[in-house]
Structures are given as C-alpha cells and as structure tokens.
Swiss-Prot record:
SUPFAM superfamilies: Ribosomal protein S10. The lineage of its organism: Bacteria, Bacillati, Bacillota, Clostridia, Thermoanaerobacterales. Involved in the binding of tRNA to the ribosomes. Part of the 30S ribosomal subunit. One of its GO terms (molecular function) is structural constituent of ribosome. One of its GO terms (biological process) is translation. Belongs to the universal ribosomal protein uS10 family. It comes from the Bacteria. This is Small ribosomal subunit protein uS10. The keyword Ribosomal protein applies.
Length: 102
C-alpha cells in the first residue's frame, strides 16, 4: 500500500493569523488519527516599493513601503477519509491563502 501525503502551504501577511491557522490544521489532523509534520516556517517574502514623495520634481525625496508575505508548510502523512473530511469543513480566517496538494 503506497503512503499518501497531503501537503498544505499557507500564506498570509499577518504572521499571528497564519500561526493560528496552522495550529488549527495540525490539531484537526492529529484528532482524526493522521501523522503531522510541521508547521515548517518557509522564508518570508519581502516586497519593497519605492515611490517619489513629490508629484513633479525632487527626485532625491522618496518613500519606501514594504509588504511581507509569511509562509508555512504542513505535511499530513497517511490521512484517513475522516481527516480529509475534517479539513474540508475547517473554518479559517479570510487573510490566509491555502494551497493543498495530494
């Protein structure tokens, strides 16, 4: 019997919401009898945007904004049908992007 694995990648701008969501997924998977590896923190993506402060000239006066994308990886090993059903019903915050691979 081949071993199955569900790989879940989570992305969010707020690390606190991301960690709460990862904890909910881990608790749900463990409660239904699956083995869990993670959450593994992946490198944070940092996008920096530089704009001119003045609308016309003054090129030396600039302002920088950044947005950080935090990421986590969770592997669920040997999931049961009960695990998959519980993960589908799980309610997570709206600021978290979830990517699931079987």
């Amino acid at each position: 019997m081949p071993k199955q694995k569900i790989r879940i990648r989570l992305k969010a701008f707020d690390h606190a919401i991301l960690d709460q969501s990862a904890q909910k997924i881990v608790e749900t998977a463990k409660r239904t009898g699956a083995e869990v590896s993670g959450p593994i923190p992946l490198p944070t993506e940092k996008d920096i945007i530089t704009i001119l402060r003045a609308p016309h000239k003054y090129k030396d006066s600039r302002e920088q904004f950044e947005i950080r994308t935090h990421k986590r990886l969770i592997d669920i090993l040997n999931p049961t049908p009960k695990t998959v059903d519980a993960l589908m019903r799980l309610d997570l915050p709206s600021g978290v992007d979830i990517e699931i691979k079987l």
